[in-house]
């Protein structure tokens, strides 16, 4: 999808009006870097609201990127899908929510953890 880009807008102090149009904005080009490895998934739940990911949002996920500690990922723990912040350190692997109402998932020896991709963008509608 391509849409007209109407310049920039100040989010702090007002800036002089810009009377020109930028080149068309291609949302696929903006959001999808590796089409063959990218999928979209709709969020169900509020465990990541502190990271700006809300119920009903659409996540852009790249399967080709390996997770690094601190990345938001899509994973399956014992067959249950989740979106969480991936943490790996000497204490092992854990999946952290961005909402204190939800528990941290600590991966125990023998527990099944499957990685499905790194979240690269979140599409959030205001209305």
Give each language-model segment a name:
Residues 50-54:
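A short glycine-leucine-enriched loop at secondary-structure breakpoints
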Residues 94-100:
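Catalytic Cys-His active-site segments of thiol-dependent hydrolases/isopeptidases
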Residues 1-49, 80-81, 88, 92, ...:
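Short, positionally conserved secondary-structure boundary motifs
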Residues 64-67, 79-81:
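Short, charged beta-turn/beta-strand-edge "cap" motif at the junction between a beta-strand
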